[in-house]
Structure formats: C-alpha cells, structure tokens
Amino acid sequence: MRARYLLIGLVVVLAVVTGVLVYRGTRADTTPSGSPVTITPLSTAAADPQTAPFAEAGPDGSSTAAATGTAVPAGDRVASNVPMTKLSPGDTAPQFIIVSFDGAGSHTKWQEFLAAAAPTNSRFNGFLTGLYLLADENKNRYTGPGHAPGKSSVGFGGTTDEIATLIGDLNQAYAAGHEIGTHYNGHFCSGAEPSGNRWSAADWSTELDQFFGFFTNYRGNNPGADLPDLTVPADSVNGGRTQCLEGVWEELLPAWKAHGLTYDSSINAPAKGIVWPQKVDDIWEFYMPYIYSPGLGGSVILMDYNMWFKFNQGQDQPETAPELRGIVYDTYTSLYDQTYHGNRAPLLIANHFNNWNGNSFNEPTLRFMQDYCGKPDTYCATYSDVIAWMELQDPAVLQQLLDQPPVGAGA
C-alpha cells in the first residue's frame, strides 16, 4: 500500500454570501484520504456554506500489480463517440453527461469504470494529480509554490511498480477515448498555506510547469525505474480542475493560456441549477452546479463529498450506504430528466475514486453510467469532445443554447 500523509486540524471558514467549503481527511480510497477541498463561488449565487473534513482518494495499486493497459500509439485511439453534426435553428441539442474523477490514481477504480463505460461506448474524464507519477523516494523533485521541497497534501506515487500500473491505466483509458486532464500537484488548500487562493499567476504557471514535467519526464524523475511508455500526449491535456477548487481567476488565466489549456471545471455556477458552459476570456468554464436534491432535502454542490456532508456531516457510517446510494442515484436521474426535457445543458457528475461511507458514491455513479449513458440522444462524453461539438455550431445557434435558463434549481 502507498504511504499516506495525515493532515491534522480543520480550518473553519465562514461565508455568508459566497460560501466556502473546506474538507480534510486521510488514507487510501477505502476511506477518506488527502487534503482539503475549498469551493469558493465566483458570484453571489447561493452556495453551500458547510465545513467538514475532506479526503481525496489517492493511488491504491499494489506494489506487485502489473500494468493492465497496453501502450497504444496515439494514432490508434478510438474515435469520439459524439456525433459532430451542426444544429439548425430550433433543433434540440444532444444530452451530454460529463463524468469526471479528481486525482485519478486508483488502479481498481480505473478498471471498474473502464469496464462500465465500454458496453455503451461511453467516455469519462480523469483529472490526474501529477505527483502520482513521482515515486515517494523522489518526492524532493517537487516544490509546490511557497512550500518546501517534497511537501504534498496528498502524498506521491508510491513505488515505481505502482507508477507503472498507473501508466498502464492512463494508456488504456486514453486509447479507449477517455480524457486525461490535470488536477495539478500538491493539493495545497486553505489551512496548508500558501494555498491556491494565495497563488500568483507565476505560482500557477510553476505548478503547471511541474505537472507537465512529471507527465513528460516521468522516467527522468524516477531514475533507474523500468517504466512503460506513457502514450497519452501531453498536448491532449486541455484542462482540468484546481485543487480544492481554489484560485483567483485573474491569476489562473495567464497560466492556463501559457500552457495551452482551453477549459476549466472549478468555478461555481453564476446561478443555481445546471447551465451550459460559458466561454470566459477564451476559456470554456464548465461551472460546478449548485442543485436541489429532494433526497437530501436541500441544495448542494453536485460533487460526491458535498453530498456526503449534506447527508450526515461527512461521517463514515457504512450502514447508511444503501440509503445514501439511493439518494445519489435518484439525484442524478432527476437531474438527467430535468436537463433532457429542459435546457439540455451538459450534466456534470464530479467525483473522486473512493469508497467513502461504504462506497456510497462510486457505486451509484457507475450504475448511473450503465443505465443512462446508452439512452437515446444521450452521450457520456469528454470535456474536449463537448467543446468540439459546441465550437462546430453556428455562433447564433450556440448562443441560443447557452442563453437558456438553468434547470435543477428546485423551488
């Protein structure tokens, strides 16, 4: 098993207008592990002013596990599953579902979701923590902005055998048409200062420099290791999600542009409900939706941990898993029905590879993919493919879609 780094303490953040979430925890994907996640809305839309410990699930591969994915040349990657057709005025858009997982380091979860996606030719997105390509013994090769060398809130990649397994998973996923994005590196959030909210444009650029360095120079950063080829092109990493959803837009933007990123999915929606992504300063922003869940009896940011905290304050109570799984699944299906019969905005299902609260989230997410990704006029897709579809449309037709009111906001 990989070493885990325990974060001690809890930062309580009060937010009346914008709302802030901070969560923290530890260990592998069988229990909460990792560091805080902070969600700070960009606007004055109602947010989820809850505070609780959070954990990001890290890599969990065995030191003896063999790399499952075969290194496939990029040219052999399967084609997009999204029909690239232009709408005429008044046509109905396809219903896109965008499933994503922050961290993307668990071999077990990669294999589960790859298997779930295959029968319906579906796609999902893994936002990789760059440090999972850096062995524990080489951790001093990373220096987070404002932090000491070798420091991280989510640990590192474990052994080189585990990194080889992860490379196999990434290759397999990319060859099957799934998308690899960035979840940056050290996961420094409020309480692990300086956190992302304090970083300058130069800091974010340094963080991305190191992410792409780990991505492209994984052999040089793990000298002597027998590692397979990573066949995922670095220039296919087009966007991602910031650690803890932190960061100031004006500081992030120059770093994104300097590294060729074209989208982000870290900012709370400017209104309650599910809306179409918007292009802001040449970056497609896929807003984190703040939705109403009947089963939870209120509104919540549509992310696994937020739903857990809304349910029982983020307490590990596996005996409640059947109830919570049902609530999560019903929330997803209700939102699908509202978007499908409403504005057809892409439905974002934001998760982590985890077994929190008795596997209360990955199980219903997997079941939702199996049940809904193959429905008529519905495509579980990558961010980049949805962007390609949107940019194919006539500007006036696309604007009509983007201007539609939100759905899923509740009363």
Please report, for each region that a protein language model flagged, where it lies by residue.
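A generic secondary-structure signal for well-formed alpha-helical elements
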Residues: 211-219, 260-263, 376
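Active-site cleft segment of glycoside hydrolase catalytic domains centered on the general acid/base Glu
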Residues: 191-210, 251
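Active-site-adjacent pocket scaffolds in enzyme catalytic domains
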Residues: 143-161, 227-343, 394-402
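Well-ordered, non-membrane alpha-helical segments in soluble/globular domains
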Residues: 110-111, 159-167, 204-209, 324-334, ...
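Active-site beta->alpha N-cap acidic-glycine motif
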Residues: 69-179, 186-190, 214, 218-247, ...
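C-terminal domain-boundary segment and adjacent tail
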Residues: 80-82, 263-276, 329-411
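N-terminal pre-catalytic segment of deacetylase/amide-hydrolase enzymes
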Residues: 4-9, 14-99, 108-114, 118-119, ...
